[in-house]
Amino acid sequence: MSEKLAARDRMIVALDLPSVEAAEAMIARLGDSASFYKIGYQLAYAGGLSMVGRLADAGKKVFVDLKLHDIGNTVGRGVESLSALGATFLTVHAYPQTMKAAVEARGDSGLKILAVTVLTSYDDSDLQEAGYRLGVRELVEQRARQAQAIGIDGLVCSPEEAAHLRGIVGRNIALVTPGIRPAGAAAGDQKRIMTPARAIAAGADYLVVGRPIVEAADPKAAASAIVEEIATATA
């Protein structure tokens, strides 16, 4: 991604919380330590999409992580509705029909479409169990090439794949990496993880961080430490 980003803007805080009230309380605790937030299934289905406009009006960026995957017409209509909310990013699964529909439907709204290659909780054995013949690395590469040809704005990938993908897609596609864990943090249910500094060095543009921040005793201090690590890695 050619755009120069401030360290704080490269950290996306995942608001994986059960209610709008809990999310708003976390945002208040984080204050100016964070500028970019992710709303996923849990919060979205608890009314969290109502926060998108308010956050945008407050100068924050919002990543709506719904991983849309349906027939093209249905995805397109969903993207049209979501594009009016004021979000910065929206995820879809990296299937050609889904990606094409999303790119066409967002129009000139400014909404950036991110394609999810392979979930960071999956490894080769999970793909084999699901019936895939390709391993994680091969499937990620295949989907990345398809996404680039379709005009996708960014890819969601594990930090382990970032360096490899950067060599494939160049600098014009943003790489967004979940599975970020500061040194010493628990991996949780993620199988392909990396520290913030290593992920930046591998070529990631944006780092999604959830539990290490929202479950920390001092979320603001945890977020500030990650931003400092990003700043050092990009200096």
UniProtKB/Swiss-Prot annotation:
Tell me which residues this entry annotates as catalytic: 67 (proton donor)
Q: Where does substrate bind?
A: 16, 38, 65-74, 120, 181, 190, 210-211
Q: What class of enzyme is it?
A: lyase
Enzyme Commission identifier(s) = 4.1.1.23
Under SMART domains, the record lists:
OMPdecase
Task: List GO molecular-function terms, semicolon-separated.
Answer: orotidine-5'-phosphate decarboxylase activity
Keyword annotations from UniProtKB, A to Z: Decarboxylase, Lyase, Pyrimidine biosynthesis
Keyword Lyase annotated: yes
| Pathway(s) per entry | Pyrimidine metabolism; UMP biosynthesis via de novo pathway; UMP from orotate: step 2/2
Any one of the GO BP annotations: 'de novo' UMP biosynthetic process
- Recorded catalytic activity of this chain's protein: orotidine 5'-phosphate + H(+) = UMP + CO2
| UniProt cross-references to CDD domains, sorted A to Z | OMP_decarboxylase_like
Q: State if DNA-binding is listed as a keyword.
A: no
User: What cellular-component terms does GO give this entry?
Assistant: cytosol
Protein task: Catalyzes the decarboxylation of orotidine 5'-monophosphate (OMP) to uridine 5'-monophosphate (UMP).
| Subunit and partners | Homodimer.
NCBIfam families, per the entry: PRK00230.1, pyrF
| Family assignment from sequence similarity | Belongs to the OMP decarboxylase family. Type 1 subfamily.
Name the UniProt record assigns to this protein: Orotidine 5'-phosphate decarboxylase
- What organism is this sequence from? Rhodopseudomonas palustris (strain BisB18)
